[in-house]
Amino acid sequence: MTQKTILNDTHRALGAKMVDFGGWDMPIHYGSQLDEHHQVRRDAGMFDVSHMTVVDLHGARVRAFLRDLLANSVDKLKVCGKALYTCMLNPQGGVIDDLIVYYMSEDFFRLVVNAATREKDLQWIGEQAVRFDVRVEERSDFAMIAVQGPNARANVIDLLDPADTAAASKLGRFAALQTRSRDGIELFLARTGYTGEDGFEIVLPQEAAVAFWNALLAQGVKPAGLGARDTLRLEAGMHLYGQDMDDAVTPYEAALAWTIALDEGRDFIGRRVLESQKAQGAPRQLIGVVMDDKGVLRHGQAVFTASGEGEILSGTFSPTLGKAIAFARVPAGSIDQLRVDIRGKQVPLRAVKFPFVRDGQAQPGVLGD
């Protein structure tokens, strides 16, 4: 049965086109995906991300548990509210999910995990938590709204209790604080996002979500759907679980080496495979590609290299760049001469470093200059 967020009726009243996304009835756009994309890059847009799963972890050994569970090291988290992006791996080094972990206190950490992986994540986390006597609490009582764009933070801060605006203004990236709105709504405010723009992801009680969404609307923040969220995140070089990596792909094969902490004295699930791949090299690599010819790059298209065949993972037409961009997974080795199969025709590709877009601008080399 398709699930609905607390904002479902609100989306429909705003004229949203709704689609099934991982079992959730979600807005793909509110009229123009292109306009919504540019709105976020140039001003501020908001997304209903209440389908995401918030998991609270409690216990005296919760830090030790996360040192074992996650490939990145929670020992980096020393200040309450600080956050870390990480992968959670299986014993073969494959990515069970990518997630954000927040340090709330020494006996309380918070995870935000993907909607499509909710059931397997909760089962895996629950199984591993037993050894550490950690209590796993899914917070299905929460909704989540992401406000993103150059003017996003200012619009949100205007709605906060005046006593909290200074702290919210000073909040650093990948950090969160507990605050409240002018109307007394309790908010978990995180300076994170999935668009490459600045902004906040806001966790709040479900029963307060419609009122807060409407307050943002009154501020002039426009709603944006999953379509724009996808083009924005790909321009920003951000991965989509299930498309760019999965249980059979290691972080080294997904260009996520920066999320691995092989710190001394810490054994974590999947570490031995990662140590081997670091020493010997991973057999596959994820790269960013741009197609200068007309057309769109789509998931599953074959990519040919001097070292063998790979495929397009996430692909789209970039509204900011005016070109087709994609992630591709190809064999390790040279990526100088790349071609993609589009309806039987081999079309040249250029390998580029990602993100493709930062602060609304094309990154060096992306446009071929």
UniProtKB/Swiss-Prot annotation:
Q: Which domain of life is it from?
A: Bacteria
Molecular function in Gene Ontology: aminomethyltransferase activity; transaminase activity
Keyword terms, alphabetized: Aminotransferase, Transferase
* Enzyme class, broadest EC rank: transferase
GO BP annotations, alphabetical order: glycine decarboxylation via glycine cleavage system
Q: Does the keyword Heme apply?
A: no
Q: What is its EC number?
A: 2.1.2.10
What intrachain disulfides are recorded? none
Gene3D superfamilies, alphabetically?
Aminomethyltransferase beta-barrel domains (3.30.70.1400), Aminomethyltransferase fragment (4.10.1250.10), Probable tRNA modification gtpase trme, domain 1 (3.30.1360.120)
Reactions performed catalytically: N(6)-[(R)-S(8)-aminomethyldihydrolipoyl]-L-lysyl-[protein] + (6S)-5,6,7,8-tetrahydrofolate = N(6)-[(R)-dihydrolipoyl]-L-lysyl-[protein] + (6R)-5,10-methylene-5,6,7,8-tetrahydrofolate + NH4(+)
Can you list the GO cellular component terms from the UniProt entry? cytosol; glycine cleavage complex
Question: Which Pfam family, any one of them, does this sequence belong to?
Answer: GCV_T_C
> What assembly does the database describe for this protein?
The glycine cleavage system is composed of four proteins: P, T, L and H.
Query: Which family is it part of?
Result: Belongs to the GcvT family.
Q: What's its job? A: The glycine cleavage system catalyzes the degradation of glycine.
PANTHER family named among the record's database cross-references:
AMINOMETHYLTRANSFERASE (PTHR43757), AMINOMETHYLTRANSFERASE, MITOCHONDRIAL (PTHR43757:SF2)
* Family matches, as HAMAP family: GcvT (MF_00259)
What name does the UniProt record give this protein? Aminomethyltransferase
Q: Which organism is this protein's natural source?
A: Xanthomonas oryzae pv. oryzae (strain KACC10331 / KXO85)
Q: Identify the coding gene.
A: gcvT
